[in-house]
Structures are given as structure tokens and as C-alpha cells.
Amino acid sequence: LKAASIAIHGITDSMLLGQPTIDLVLPAFHEFCADTVLVGHNVAFDMRFLELKEASLGLRFDQPVLDTLLLSAVAHPNQQSHSLEAIMQRLGIDMGQRHNALADATATAQVFMRLLPALAEQGIVTLRQALEASQKTYFAQVKY
């Protein structure tokens, strides 16, 4: 692992020794999240990673995906930043410990729940409406 990555996430090479590989973990994750809506922040990056593994593992992540970055751009179009930190600050969510998977997932869930009323004020109340509005944002065009 690169030093910069270790500094952000705190995960070291020694922590990964003896752990299952992505080829073992991803099928279990795929089964776990089947028939759900995935919610994440800047999820295009994560979905690209999953897409790169789909063919070799015989998987397909085809469920709907809501991205809090895109939803923030819909709910707050005049804001310059839609980073997770900026959204949390804007919505009054405690930053706490960040940059580990559980803390980031919890923060994203809190952001998602707080964005729902702002989206509802714009008449966005269904999954389809949220997906369609998200795809109209500039950020939806970013590819990884």
C-alpha cells in the first residue's frame, strides 16, 4: 500500500495479511446486497471498481444506485462543494472519526436521510424521480 493511502485510511500491509481476497469477498457482498438499492457517496468510483471485477467473477451489480454527491447537487444546486465533509457541515452532521469504512458508511447514511426532506420539497419522492434528477447533474457525467 502507498504511504498516502495508509495516512488516510490507517490500513497497513500487515493488516491485510491473511485476509480474504476481493475474489472471495465480492461474491458474498453481491449476495448480501441483492434486491436492494445501493446508497453511497461519489459512488461512480466504487461502481467502476465493481464493474472491473464483474466479468472475472461472473457477477453483475445491476441494482439501482443512489449517490449522495448527486443528490446533494440536486437538493443544493447553488453550493460549490458536494464533498461528504461539505455536505455534513452544511446539514449539521457531526464529522466525528472519518476515513474508515464504517464511519464513512454511517456518515453517508446520515447525509442521505437528511437530504430526503430537501428532495421532497422539490417533488422528488420516489426512487425513479431521485435517479432521474441525479442523472441531470453535472457530476453524473464524471467517469472513472
Listing of model-derived features with the role each one plays in the protein:
Residues 104:
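Conserved catalytic/binding loops enriched for acidic/polar residues
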Residues 71, 87, 107, 111-114:
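Generic recognition of well-ordered alpha-helical segments
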Residues 60-72:
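Conserved beta-strand -> loop -> alpha-helix junction used to position metal-binding or nucleic-acid-contacting
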Residues 109, 113-144:
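Acidic two-metal-ion nuclease catalytic site recognized across multiple nuclease folds
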Residues 6, 69, 85, 128-132:
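Generic detector of well-ordered alpha-helical segments enriched in charged/polar residues
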Residues 1-63, 77-99, 139:
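Conserved non-catalytic scaffold segment of RNase H-like nuclease domains
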Residues 36, 68, 108:
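Ser/Thr-centric signal marking residues that sit
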